[in-house]
Every structure is written in structure tokens, then in C-alpha cells.
UniProtKB/Swiss-Prot annotation:
Protein name: Lateral signaling target protein 2 homolog
Organism in which the protein naturally occurs: Drosophila grimshawi (Hawaiian fruit fly)
Keyword presence, Methyltransferase: no
Chain spans, region Disordered: 308-488, 545-586, 600-742, 879-1027, 1088-1115
Record GO cellular component, one term: early endosome membrane
Record InterPro entries: FYVE_LST2, LST-2, Znf_FYVE, Znf_FYVE-rel, Znf_FYVE_PHD, Znf_RING/FYVE/PHD
Ranges of compositional bias, category Acidic residues: 449-488
PANTHER family in alphabetical order: LATERAL SIGNALING TARGET PROTEIN 2 HOMOLOG
List of residues that carry Phosphoserine: 603-604, 908
Low complexity compositional bias, start-end: 322-361, 374-417, 425-444, 558-577, 600-614, 658-676, 714-726, 733-742, 881-901, 921-975, 988-1020, 1090-1100
Keyword list, A-Z: Metal-binding, Phosphoprotein, Zinc, Zinc-finger
One Pfam family, short name: FYVE
Zinc fingers typed FYVE-type, residue spans: 1025-1085
């Protein structure tokens, strides 16, 4: 019996109730599952694939209906799913439930997720519980479909007192809880779900993006209009700029590369290695170079580092350098030997000229890395002598207040002092600048670095020297002794670090290649992937690691010996090669030494141990210290002259003193016997240069030889010092050495990292490729997160919406008109009749002074009939007196003066309330306006009928004849009316007064004494455009092309087709034809015909008696 009842209650196929839909979906799913179990899927893979696809679709359908049933039955008792906020947008799809069911069945059957075996093992019991609970729910729902189904019911009609219903309720709650738990576990295993820390980091990244956008708007890289318009280009520009700002400007923010990798955001964690290398290169950029990079990231424009003087922190080429550069480009095509001699002479003159005029010399002294200025004369100077002399000159130069770039012995090879035979673009000055100024600054003090750059344009040489000495840590003192043993040991520690850097950069055998484009010598080992083609995919190793070039000193020494042996057998070839392409190791050493000195300054100043008067930055042996102290005092008076002409000695034959020559000769003899196995490549370069010297310059050669020997002994201090001094070195504070070692290594790595690039354009272009590559990968790998961040950034930084301006309602009738009549509109053929309400005074207000003229003179001209006054009204008394005065010519002046006395001027239709406040005059004026309105309506109807009659017959109407015969001086409405009244004979039957009287006694009009109607009605309010998306007649939707039109009669909104009619609306004061809809047009036309018929009946006897009154009045 129960089975029979269920068969009878089986839902129909067209039943739309929830239970019926579930019943049929469940039956279809069962059929597909049975078919899948009926054959071997490996034998028929195509059929199996189709059935699996159908199975997934049916599962989605069954779970969707089950979810709706749970929503209605459980309501608020459903298990919360707030964890879905952690899911990416790609996961939250409509078929997510079906995927979860399919995954639960696979896990319950023993399958595992690929590469997630451990997670699959943990989820397997939960998956089995989910499938078992879902099967039980399906059975109970099928039973309810056969018991309590109401066909086509929108709600469930279940008996809650039934035990089966309560069982279904509890089963649904259990299934909902298990399915929610399995959803979180399964999705977390398939995709990475963010933790609380990751959400906080993502919010900080959003703050970084917002700060970057505001900074870009302030600097001028972006426009506010682009933000308001949601420019798609900002989707790429903002992440790129945020990477630069996060690494440099806001270095303590979410892109702080000093924090552990696991604390970084998930978005930037895969790029941590490359971001660290980008940060190191960004810190070497000046303020202008950073701006050029950011501009390149925004606009992809060409890089332009040619900045005029004083515009940025990059020092522009001085006039002397521009002249020398032009000389260089000209002389480059000639013989190199001849140009070398001329270059040395030009260098001497330039140095003399630049003594008191060079500005901003702190950065040029760090830009001594220009390898292209090493001509034949400069190649004879060893790098060790350059470094040692560069370290000894600042103290001497401090007395004469001369910029360090002039006092340096390598000043002849600086870009601003010496013309070079190789082509030198003007932007190459900054391309080889050292990172000594910025590499040691902490990221938090980047703003201080920017502020310092703003003061680079001072024209005072002394102020620049003081600023440079303060920044570089050079003390301006001549009275202090040399550093004590502790400072010497600290310097020795720095020198050991410096030795490793120079050895790694300069002593690699056979790895120096000339770069023809820039004149640099770039090591092949330093190129790495930095100079690889742009088509190479972005990896973490596309920036060469600086650790590879540093190496250890032992490996460098092992590579040094075969190089020296090879160069010893090829002296002539090496001499020519060094003459043409020698790398400026001394410049790199000088830039590195300035960085070391800046690092050493806090430690030496803390012990109140000022630097010596000659500011030695290298460590000397004890025997050399006494000699240096005595020789510094002996050469103090002429050291400035020596440093200025260091490279011009060969041409001016400046001979040193005898004592210096003897000492130099002795040192030369001693150095010839000195083994060179412990010196680095710069000493070996000196060996070859020594053999290439000429005899007349032996004294200068000896001096340089002695200088080189001092530096050689400096590097090998530990081999030449005594046992007591060795113990002093061992007593160096280990904590200070370890703390300074990190700073020194960081500074040296940053300095050498920039030397790998042949120009500033190459550096900026490589940074652009790197930063753009990281930002573009964010667009691909983290598209959902990036969209959410950018959406928030746009909403936070877009301009505030303008407040709705409340337009006050128009109170004056004159402002309700759609347009103002011009003078041409007033004097048209139809405007001269009574239908025009636009006064000529509004068009030509200069005639207001008509009433201000003398009433005693020209009285006849200002009579009521002959005046040109505009917008004036005449009452009945005035008309009567005017008509009576026309009977005799003797009383013309008195009648005209009487008429003027009764003329009341009204300024405009909207200014009636500003007229006379007298009650009697106000009532009289209202009566006159009412009569005139009735007369205008009657005349308009008659004219319309006459116009229609003329159009159909083709004859000239009396009105047209009257209008054409009227004089041009009576074109205004008032003058036409008054003139016609004045010219009518007294015996005519159709006078204006009788017409007015007739109109006043007609049924359609109002009596003279009892008129209560208003002059004009206020136009209807227009329906706003926003409330009328469709035409109110044809219901056609409005588009950009199909515009809205308002009917002036009803205020409705219509399309152009439904409102193409036009008709005058006298009841609203609109006597000219205006736009009306078709319905209003038909209604107005019917009214016009009815009024025309009544008007023709009124005037028919008058026309019979008077013949053609209009023609008579015109005559």
C-alpha cells in the first residue's frame, strides 16, 4: 500500500517545486553512476570520459538543490563559512560543490592528491564521513519527495511533527558541518590559503601602493585624472613604482629585505634574492637617476641623463669639461701620441683655471672611475701611487681651501679636468660614479640623502669644500700628529678589505676586455647575466652575484702569480696594451677609500683621535712613518703646486729639490732590488711603466716609485713589522672589527656592483628590465591579490565626488522662458503683431532714457502714437484721450502730454512686483494686462486661420498686406498698436476701443469689472532626465544618439519623433512656437480652431461694415 501511494505521489516532470527538482536530479545522477559501474572504463575511455562529465554536472545540480533546501530548512543553524574570504577568487566558482563531492569520493576510494599525499591521508576519514552523510541525506530527501511534495510550490511543506522530518533536519545539519569542514581542508590542500599574518602583510602592501601613488602624484610622475579615470596603464605603473619605493624610500616597510624571508609577503617572497640585488643597485643611484628610472617605469620613454647644471644631484659637465670633450672628439681621429701630449698640456691649463671656479666637487672626486681618460701620460702612473697620493692630499689642500678634485694627483684624469682621446658622452660622468656616498647610508636615512643633494648647486667654492669634508670625514687640521697604533691597526684592517676588492676587480688574468662603445674595461666575470639579451627569461640569477667577484685573498694571490709571469714575458705587448686601455684602478681605489674613511670616522672620533695633517688612509711601516712626518713638513709649502701639475711635469720639466731627488734615487735603487712577489697587479703595472720612462724625467719617476713602494709596504705590513707591533695588531678590538667588516663588505660590494655597467643608460635599463619583470610576474602569479590591492588604492586616492548643487527654483516668469528674444526676433514679420510678448526694451535697453528727456521739447515726437518706447502699456483712459485728441490738430500737444502722463512703464514681465505700490494703479494695470492678453489670443487665432487660408488659396491676406504696408518705425508691438489706433479715422466702426469693448462683452472673455483670471499660467515642471529612461509616448529607451526632449505644455519627456511638433502656448506666456508633443499639439490645434470660429463670428458684422479694416488702418 505504501509503495502504491508513493507511485501515485511521484513528482511530474514539469513540477517546479524544490522536492520535485531534487527527485529528478537524483534519479539522473543514479542512472549515470549505474552506467559507469556497468562497464570497464579502461576498455572504453571515450565513453567513460563522457559519463564522468555528465556525472560531475549531475552532482553539481543535486548539491545546488540540496543547498537551497538547507537554506530554507536550517536557516541560521547552518554552519558558518567565513573561511571563504581566504579563498582566491578563482576558487569560488559555481561548480565548487561538485568538485568537492568528486574529490571526497576519490579520497574515500583511496586516491590521493598529487604531491599532497600527507594531506590526502589526513583528509581521507573526513571524506568518507562526507560521502556517507550525503548518501543518507539523499535517501531522506527522496522519501520526502514521495510523501509531502506539493506540486509547483515555491516553499517546502513538511510536517515538522513527523519523525522523518526531524531525522531529515538533523541529517542536514550533520552533513552541512562535515561538508564545510571538508571544503576548508580540501581547498587549503589544493591552493595556499592566507594566514592572519599574510593578510596583515597584504594590507601593508596596499598601504605601500597608496603611499607610492601619492608620492608619484606629488612628484609629477602621474596625474590625478588618470586615477579618477582608472587608467589601465596605472595597473602596471603602480606596482613598478611601489617596488622602487619599497626598496629605497620606505625601506623599513613591507619590502624590507633585511627581515627574514618567511616574514615577507607571499607576493614578494619568491623574488627576495633579486629584490636584494635591485636594492643594492638602487642605493647607488643619485636623486636624478632615481627620478629618471621612475619616469622610465611609468612612461617607457628614453633615458635622458643630460641634466643641466643645478637641476639635480648629478653634477652636470662644467664648461671646461665641455670644451675639453669637444676637443677630445675632434682629436680622437688623429694620432694618439700627438693627442696625448696636447691632452697633458690642456689638462694643466684646465686645472689652473678650475682652482677657484669648480663647484660641487665632492661627487666628481668619487667619479674618478672614468677609464677612458687614461692616455699615455696617465698610464705611466701606478695605481698604488694614485691611491697613496690621493690619501695624502686632503690635509694639505685644506689649508688653501682648494677642492679635493683639484688636489688629487689623478685630477688630470678626471672627466672634468683632462680631455681624453676617446669619445666621451656627457652622461658618462654619472655612469661611473661610485656608490661611496649612498651605499653606507641606512635605508631609513634615504630622505636625508635626498636633502643633501638639494644643496649641490652652491656657487661658493669654500662652502662646497666644507660640505665635502664633512661628508667624507676629512678633518681640517694641520697641527695634529699621525694616527696612533690603534688607528693604524684599524686602517690596516680596512686596507686588507680594500686589497681583496682591488685584487678581485683588477687582477684576474686575461679577463679584461675593452668596450668600444664606452671605452671601459669590463671584466667578463662581472658581466654575468646582467648584460644578457632581453629575451632571456627572468630568473633570480639575472643580476650577477657580487660574491663571485670578491672571492678570497688566497685565490686571488694564486691567480696573481701566473699573471705576473705572463706579463713578464710579454712586456712590450703589455706596455702598449696598458697605454691604450689601462683600467683606472686608482680611481676605483680612491672611491673605495673614501667609503672606508667615512666608515672609519666614527671609530676614530670616539677615541678623540683626529686624523693626521696629511690624512694618510693607508697603513705604513714604522720606518716609513718618521720619514713621512718629516717629509710632509718639508714639502708643505710647495705640495699644492706639485698636486696641481702632477701630470704636467713631463712637459714643464719641473725639477724637485736636490734632497728629494737624492732620496728618490735611493728609493729607486732600493726598490729595484725589492721582490715583487707580494705586491698586487698595480705594482706590476708600475714595473712596466718604470721601464718605459724617459731619462729627462727620472726625478718624477723616482718620486712616483717611492710612492708606490710605500704603498707596497703598506699592504705587507704584517711581514715587515716587529713582534711588538704584531702584538698590537692582535689586540685590536674584535667587536669593532666585526661590526665594521659588515659595513665595509657591503660598501665595497655596492661600489664594485656599479662598476660592472658601462654607462648610466645601461644601468637604468637593466634596473627597468628587472623591476618590470618582477611587477609583471605579480600580475600573472598573484592576479587576484593585486586586483584587490589596486582596487583599494584607486578608491582611496580618487578625487572626492562633487556635491550635488541644489538649483533654486525659478521665481520670475521671465526666467521660465526657454530663450531670450534677440532684436531680429522682435522685428520679424510676425513679431510686430500683438502676439509677441518679448519687449524691445529687453533687446535694446539703451532706449530707457526716452522718459528722461525734457517733456517741454519735442512733445509731438513723444506722443502716445508716435513714440518708439518699448515694453510700455497704455490704459483705457490713455487710449480714449489719445483717440479724442486725434480729431483736432490744435490739441495735439496737450493730448500727447496728457497721454505721457498716463503712461506707466513696466520694466519686464518678471518685475511687476517692483512697480508702483498704489492699490488703484495696481488694479488698473492688472485689468489692462488682462484685456491685452485676451486681445492677443483673439488676434493670434485670427492670424492662424488667415495663414491657413492663404496657404490653401494662395491669395494675400489682409493681415499680410497690413504688415507689409506698415512703416518700419512701427515695428515694435506697442508702437504698431498705438500707431494704428492713432491713424484710424473717428468715423470708422472698428476702432480698438470698440474692439476691446466687444471682446470684453463676449462670452469667451471676461467683463471689464469682474476679471479674476491670472495674466499667465506658470509652465509645468519638467520631469528630470534620470526619471525618464524611456520615451513617454513610444517607450523607446534613450541612448547617446536618441536624446530626450521636453514638451513645454505637459513637461513630459519624449524622443525627437514624438515631439517634433511646435505650437505657441499663450497661456504660459510663450507666444512663439515651442516644442510640444503630438498629443499636446493636437489639443492646442483643436482649441485654436474653436477660438478661431468664435472670433470669426464676432468680427463678421464689423468686416461687412468696414470692408477691409486692416487694409484701411494700414493706409
Amino acid at each position: 500500500m505504501d509503495t502504491f501511494r508513493k507511485w501515485l505521489n511521484k513528482p511530474k516532470a514539469d513540477d517546479k517545486s524544490l522536492l520535485a527538482r531534487f527527485y529528478h536530479a537524483d534519479r539522473s545522477l543514479t542512472a549515470v553512476a549505474s552506467e559507469l559501474d556497468s562497464f570497464d572504463g579502461r576498455a572504453e575511455p571515450d565513453r567513460c570520459t563522457r559519463l564522468v562529465s555528465r556525472l560531475r554536472q549531475n552532482q553539481d545540480k543535486v548539491l545546488a538543490i540540496t543547498n537551497m533546501i538547507m537554506e530554507e530548512l536550517l536557516g541560521e543553524d547552518r554552519d558558518p563559512r567565513a573561511f571563504r574570504a581566504k579563498f582566491p577568487e578563482e576558487v569560488l566558482q559555481e561548480n565548487l560543490a561538485g568538485q568537492l563531492w568528486f574529490g571526497a569520493e576519490c579520497l574515500a576510494a583511496g586516491s590521493s592528491i598529487l604531491n599532497r599525499e600527507s594531506e590526502s591521508k589526513e583528509m581521507r576519514p573526513l571524506a568518507q564521513a562526507v560521502t556517507k552523510s550525503l548518501g543518507h541525506v539523499r535517501v531522506l530527501l527522496r522519501d520526502q519527495c514521495l510523501r509531502n511534495n506539493v506540486p509547483n510550490s515555491k516553499t517546502l511543506h513538511l510536517d515538522f511533527n513527523d519523525s522523518n522530518t526531524e531525522q531529515l533536519y538533523e541529517s542536514l545539519k550533520i552533513f552541512d558541518h562535515l561538508f564545510a569542514e571538508f571544503e576548508l581542508s580540501y581547498v587549503s590542500a589544493m591552493v595556499q590559503v592566507k594566514s592572519r599574518h599574510e593578510y596583515e602583510m597584504q594590507q601593508w602592501i596596499g598601504v605601500l601602493f597608496s603611499e607610492t601613488l601619492q608620492r608619484s602624484l606629488k612628484v609629477g610622475l602621474l596625474d590625478q585624472d588618470m586615477v579618477d579615470a582608472f587608467d589601465p596603464g596605472l595597473m602596471f605603473s603602480i606596482p613598478r613604482l611601489a617596488i622602487v619605493a619599497g626598496l629605497v624610500v620606505y625601506a623599513k616597510g613591507p619590502l624590507n629585505m633585511d627581515m627574514p624571508g618567511d616574514q615577507l609577503s607571499e607576493m614578494f617572497r619568491p623574488f627576495r634574492t633579486i629584490l636584494i640585488k635591485i636594492r643594492d643597485l638602487l642605493r647607488n643611484l643619485s636623486k636624478q637617476e632615481l627620478y629618471q628610472l621612475e619616469k622610465l617605469l611609468c612612461t617607457n620613454e628614453d633615458i635622458n641623463t643630460k641634466v643641466p647644471l643645478g637641476s639635480s644631484s648629478i653634477e652636470a659637465p662644467s664648461p671646461e669639461h665641455n670644451n675639453s670633450s669637444s676637443t677630445t672628439n675632434t682629436s680622437n681621429n688623429n694620432n694618439n701620441n700627438t693627442n696625448n701630449n696636447n691632452s697633458s698640456s690642456g689638462s694643466d691649463c684646465t686645472n689652473n683655471d678650475k682652482t677657484g671656479t669648480t663647484t660641487n666637487t665632492h661627487k666628481p672626486v668619487e667619479r674618478l672611475v672614468d677609464h677612458r681618460n687614461n692616455n699615455t701620460t696617465n698610464s705611466q702612473q701606478t695605481s698604488s701611487c694614485s691611491v697613496n697620493a690621493a690619501a695624502t692630499t686632503p690635509a694639505t689642500s685644506s689649508r688653501t681651501r682648494t677642492p679635493p678634485s683639484i688636489l688629487s694627483p689623478s685630477a688630470g684624469s678626471t672627466p672634468t679636468a683632462s680631455p681624453a682621446p676617446s669619445p666621451t658622452p656627457s652622461h658618462s660622468i654619472a655612469s661611473t660614479s661610485s656608490a661611496a656616498t649612498t651605499s653606507t647610508n641606512s635605508p631609513a636615512h634615504w630622505s636625508d640623502y635626498d636633502d643633501d643633494d638639494e644643496d649641490d648647486d652652491d656657487d661658493d667654492v669654500h662652502a662646497d669644500v666644507e660640505e665635502d669634508e664633512d661628508e667624507s670625514g676629512i678633518l681640517d687640521s694641520d697641527e695634529h700628529d699621525l694616527n696612533d697604533d690603534s688607528d693604524s691597526e684599524v686602517d690596516e684592517f680596512f686596507e686588507a678589505q680594500l686589497k681583496a676588492i682591488v685584487a678581485a676587480v683588477d687582477c684576474a688574468p686575461g679577463y679584461l676586455i675593452p668596450d668600444c662603445a664606452s671605452g671601459y674595461l669590463i671584466s667578463n666575470t662581472n658581466l654575468g647575466n646582467l648584460l644578457q639579451p632581453q629575451q632571456v627569461p627572468l630568473t633570480d640569477n639575472f643580476v650577477a652575484s657580487e660574491d663571485d667577484e670578491l672571492g678570497n685573498p688566497t685565490a686571488v694571490d694564486q691567480q696573481q702569480q701566473p699573471q705576473q709571469q705572463l706579463e713578464h714575458h710579454q712586456q712590450q705587448l703589455q706596455q702598449q696594451q696598458h697605454t691604450e686601455d689601462e683600467p683606472s684602478t686608482s680611481a676605483a681605489m680612491l672611491a673605495a677609500r673614501r667609503t672606508l674613511q667615512r666608515l672609519r670616522l666614527p671609530s676614530s672620533s670616539s677615541d678623540n683621535e683626529p686624523s693626521s695633517n696629511n690624512q694618510q688612509m693607508t697603513i705604513k711601516s714604522p720606518s716609513e712613518q718618521t720619514t713621512t712626518r718629516s717629509s710632509s713638513n718639508r714639502h708643505r709649502h710647495h705640495s699644492h703646486h706639485h698636486h696641481h701639475h702632477h701630470h704636467s711635469h713631463h712637459h714643464h720639466h719641473h725639477q724637485p729639490t736636490a734632497a728629494v731627488a737624492v732620496a728618490a734615487a735611493q728609493d729607486e735603487q732600493h726598490n729595484n732590488n725589492q721582490p715583487h712577489s707580494h705586491s698586487h697587479s698595480s705594482s706590476h703595472h708600475h714595473h712596466h711603466n718604470h721601464q718605459s720612462h724617459s731619462h729627462p724625467h727620472r726625478a718624477n719617476r723616482s718620486t712616483r716609485k717611492r710612492c708606490s713602494q710605500e704603498h707596497c709596504e703598506t699592504i705587507t705590513t704584517t711581514k715587515t713589522t716587529s713582534g711588538g707591533e704584531q702584538q698590537t695588531e692582535d689586540s685590536l678590538d674584535s667587536s669593532t672589527a666585526s661590526s665594521l667588516s659588515d659595513d665595509v663588505s657591503l660598501a665595497m660590494r655596492n661600489t664594485t656592483a656599479r662598476l660592472k655597467f658601462k654607462s648610466t643608460e645601461n644601468l637604468l635599463h637593466r634596473l627597468f628590465v628587472c623591476i618590470a619583470g618582477v611587477a609583471d610576474q605579480l600580475q600573472t602569479n598573484f592576479a587576484s591579490d593585486l586586483r584587490q590591492i589596486l582596487r583599494s588604492v584607486f578608491l582611496m586616492n580618487m578625487s572626492s565626488a562633487q556635491e550635488d548643487i541644489d538649483i533654486p527654483e525659478k521665481t520670475k516668469e521671465s526666467e521660465l522662458f526657454e530663450f531670450r528674444a534677440s532684436e531680429n526676433d522682435v522685428i520679424q514679420e510676425s513679431a510686430g503683431s500683438n502676439q509677441s510678448i518679448y519687449s524691445a526694451e529687453e533687446v535694446n535697453p539703451e532706449l530707457d532714457n526716452v522718459f528722461n528727456t525734457n517733456t517741454g521739447t519735442n512733445g509731438a515726437r513723444h506722443s502716445a502714437g508716435a513714440t518708439m518706447q518699448r515694453n510700455n502699456t497704455i490704459d483705457l483712459a490713455t487710449v480714449q484721450s489719445s483717440n479724442s485728441g486725434n480729431s483736432s490738430s490744435s490739441n495735439s500737444s496737450s493730448s500727447s502730454s496728457a497721454a505721457r502722463s498716463h503712461v506707466a512703464r513696466s520694466r519686464s514681465l518678471g518685475d511687476h512686483d517692483q512697480a508702483s505700490t498704489s492699490s488703484s494703479q495696481q488694479q488698473q494695470r492688472e485689468l489692462q494686462l488682462q484685456l491685452q492678453q485676451q486681445q492677443q489670443q483673439q488676434a493670434q487665432m485670427q492670424q492662424q486661420l488667415q495663414r491657413h487660408r492663404n496657404n490653401s488659396v494662395g491669395s494675400n491676406s489682409p493681415s499680410s498686406a497690413s504688415s507689409t504696408s506698415s512703416n518700419s518705425e512701427h515695428n515694435s508691438p506697442v508702437s504698431t498698436r498705438s500707431g494704428s489706433r492713432r491713424r484710424l479715422p473717428s468715423n470708422t466702426t472698428t476702432t480698438l476701443s470698440t474692439s476691446i469693448g466687444t471682446a470684453a462683452t463676449t462670452p469667451t472673455g471676461a467683463t471689464t469689472t469682474g476679471v479674476t483670471t491670472t495674466t499667465t499660467m506658470s509652465p509645468p515642471a519638467w520631469i528630470p532626465d534620470g526619471k525618464a529612461p524611456r520615451c513617454m509616448s513610444c517607450q523607446t529607451p534613450f541612448t547617446v544618439v536618441r536624446r530626450r526632449h521636453h514638451c513645454r505644455n505637459c513637461g513630459g519627456v519624449f524622443c525627437g519623433v514624438c515631439s517634433n511638433a511646435s505650437a505657441p502656448l499663450p497661456k504660459y506666456g510663450l507666444t512663439k512656437a515651442v516644442r510640444v508633443c503630438r498629443e499636446c499639439f493636437m489639443r492646442e490645434v483643436r482649441q485654436s480652431h474653436s477660438h478661431g470660429q468664435s472670433q470669426s463670428q464676432i468680427h463678421s458684422p464689423t468686416q461687412q461694415a468696414g470692408g477691409r479694416p486692416q487694409a484701411a488702418s494700414a493706409s
